[in-house]
UniProtKB/Swiss-Prot annotation:
Belongs to the pseudouridine synthase TruD family. Its EC number is 5.4.99.-. This is Pseudouridylate synthase PUS7L. It comes from Danio rerio. Gene3D superfamilies: TruD, catalytic domain (3.30.2350.20). GO terms for biological process: mRNA processing; mRNA pseudouridine synthesis; pseudouridine synthesis. Residues 370-597 form the TRUD domain. One of its GO terms (cellular component) is nucleus. It holds the Pfam family TruD.
């Protein structure tokens, strides 16, 4: 089956050819917030309260967050933060500790990382070092930061495994109120008691622990206390959490920049971590985009001070104001698009004189009938040799070594990152490849650092994946499931037609957008179309939903249901549980409408004359719900595969 061909259309208009994204100005994306307002709206009372203007007329509804659209990427690259020479000293220091840990009666060996006069930069160094080396303590003496072995880590590593101890200390350092960490099952009550006592003694003011039984095995969970439930006495930890409760909201305008690239630069300028920024969704690179953001631990005044530095990198900030909490993924109604399609031409049947009529028919068809709600090419990455869904398939099979090889498969280009990938595949030398890998490739560098430390076998590759943020690991699994969904949608329309048929799935009650399979999903919420309902045409095609594979979804009860089983078996996943336990990944699945419709769609056809010829361009504006793709909508309008 062709991987990238989304050629199944639902309208029969002729369509036309044209080019998109000739420049960022031709592709403008404006986020629509949960109140139906553009996030770049201007209000004279902005400093007092959030903007209340520019309500949309259409019927976009808040949709279920699709966390796979968001490639959240924490950047703890010590080469960037400390410098190459200091980081090498630190790695040498940690290697010596691994070989010969300090005993209790030995004097603690320390290493100086240098002086950092800026307190925000000191916070970055503390967090980055502890993330990369959880077994180290970081100490500040005036402006100097020193590191030494953490005896608490060694104690916990003696009670649990070293890997669990690392994950636990990262969990503690993240300081996310209400978050939970679960130790591996432990049948020894005496041993569990020791773990309880350790956590209570060392972190009792921050966390609470309890044991629970899961599949006849007992586990310990640790929950970070909510802020209101912590002891009232102010401690250093309380002060730090109070500082971290400072939030500033703003709108980011960026041009020709990845969302994560923009965040990494802003974090470096402000002296915070990329993980201190939150947003509702990832936006296109080759575009001008406006999106809401919230940054932690930075005041509005400090953010505004850095505005000129951001502008030098193609970013502008506006609507800067205090906020009470971080922004959650999926917290938007959708996106507004202002697009220009250039170099318009017919597919071949008519002359240019007929172009206005052809365009009008195409736009009206999609306005009334919608388009097949395929996942767009952004979902699968930009690679031509290996795409994200292939990595996801290897992870679902728990073939860690194969997944890492796919992850590092280079493109045909000869730039630095592909040279580094090529070197790793040819030599297996993670350390040398790390030196070659550009500093801005944070994911690859995190993976290489872990492979250098733990080796490139099955266990080392597992640790390599665990070095990446959870959202990045699960992205690859969701990419595979999205590929299957796209192919299922094409099969459904080609084999079963353009009307609901017996066995199709619909919502028992009206629901907009994606619905996660774990969100209180009971059987009555999913309705299976009956023979009588098919005969009486009770439902329309835009009510049909298709499951994205997972362990909590119901499959159609017709040919399409069997197709899903055959398709998964084709990839060796006939008994897949859609859980990758070593990587702490779970894919419940979700339900996605087969069709989507643009709202508030307008267009205008323009002609520009030159000495040689007349050229036509189409300006097209519309709104889409979250998780819908403008390029897919354009593909239906133009009758062209833009993937």
């Amino acid at each position: 089956m062709e991987r990238n061909t989304l050629s199944c259309f639902i309208s029969d208009h002729e369509g036309f050819n044209g080019t998109i994204k000739n420049s960022p100005q031709d592709f403008v994306v404006i986020e629509i917030d949960t109140n139906g307002q553009f996030v770049n709206s201007v209000n004279t009372e902005e400093e007092e309260r959030p903007c209340q203007t520019t309500k949309r007329i259409g019927k976009l509804k808040p949709s279920k967050p699709d966390d796979t659209d968001s490639l959240i990427q924490d950047c703890f690259d010590l080469n960037l933060i400390l410098g190459l020479s200091v980081n090498r000293e630190l790695e040498h220091f940690t290697n010596k500790l691994k070989v010969k840990p300090c005993s209790d009666d030995q004097e603690k060996v320390e290493l100086s990382l240098g002086t950092f006069p800026d307190k925000h930069m000191r916070a970055v160094v503390h967090k980055a070092v502890r993330f990369n080396f959880p077994f180290l303590q970081t100490l500040t003496n005036q402006s100097e930061i020193r590191v030494r072995e953490d005896p608490d880590f060694q104690e916990l590593a003696g009670l649990a495994s070293e890997g669990e101890a690392e994950d636990f200390f990262r969990f503690i350092d993240a300081k996310t109120p209400g978050s939970v960490f679960t130790f591996l099952p432990d049948d020894s009550k005496e041993h569990r008691t020791s773990v309880h006592h350790f956590v209570s003694r060392r972190f009792g003011k921050l966390v609470e622990t309890k044991s629970f039984v899961d599949q006849q095995k007992t586990c310990i969970t640790v929950r970070l206390r909510e802020r209101g439930k912590q002891a009232k006495k102010r401690t250093m930890a309380d002060c730090q959490m109070q500082e971290e409760s400072l939030y500033t909201a703003f709108t980011l305008r960026k041009e020709n920049l990845e969302t994560l690239e923009a965040i990494s630069y802003m974090a470096a300028v402000l002296g915070v971590l990329p993980s201190d920024f939150t947003y509702a969704g990832i936006k296109d690179k080759r575009a001008i985009t406006y999106q809401a953001m919230v940054v932690k631990k930075i005041s509005p005044e400090r953010l505004l001070e850095k505005g000129s530095e951001f502008e030098r990198r193609g970013m502008e900030i506006s609507r800067v104001r205090p906020a009470f909490e971080a922004l959650k993924l999926g917290r938007l109604q959708g996106n507004h698009f202002e697009l220009v399609i250039r170099d318009l031409k017919h597919h071949g049947k008519h002359g240019l004189a007929e172009l206005p009529k052809v365009i009008e028919e195409a736009v009206e068809n999609v306005k009334n009938k919608g388009f097949v709600n395929y996942y767009g090419p952004q979902r699968f990455g930009s690679g031509s040799c290996v795409q994200a869904d292939q990595v996801g398939l290897a992870l679902l099979k728990e073939n860690m070594e194969a997944s890492v090889k796919l992850f590092f498969t280079p493109e045909d280009d000869d730039d630095l990152q592909n040279k580094a990938k090529r070197h790793f595949l040819h030599t297996g030398n993670a350390k040398e490849s790390l030196v070659l890998m550009p500093a801005y490739k944070a994911r690859e560098r995190l993976m290489l650092r872990a492979l250098h430390r733990y080796g490139s076998g099955q266990e080392g590759c597992t640790r390599g994946w665990l070095s990446l943020p959870h959202s990045m690991r699960v992205f690859y699994l969701h990419s595979y499931c999205s590929r299957v969904w796209n192919q299922a949608a094409k099969y459904r329309l080609q084999k079963l037609g353009f009307k609901p048929v017996q066995g199709d799935l619909v919502w028992a009650e009206p629901v907009k957008g994606l619905k996660d399979a774990t969100e209180e999903l009971s059987a009555p919420q999913i309705h299976v179309v009956t023979s009588d309902e098919e005969k009486n045409e009770v439902f329309s095609l835009d009510q049909v939903i298709l499951p994205m594979p997972g362990n909590s979804v119901k499959y159609p009860e017709n040919l399409l249901g069997q197709w899903y089983q055959d398709r998964l078996a084709q990839d060796g996943l006939e008994s897949c549980r859609f859980r990758v336990t070593p990587l702490k990944l779970n894919v419940p699945g979700c339900y996605r409408p087969l069709l989507a419709k643009p709202q508030n769609i307008t267009y205008s056809l323009q002609t520009s004359s030159s000495d040689e010829s007349n050229t036509h361009c189409l300006s097209l504006n519309f709104d889409l719900e979250a998780s819908c793709y403008a390029t897919v909508c354009l593909g239906e309008i133009m009758k062209t595969n833009l993937s």
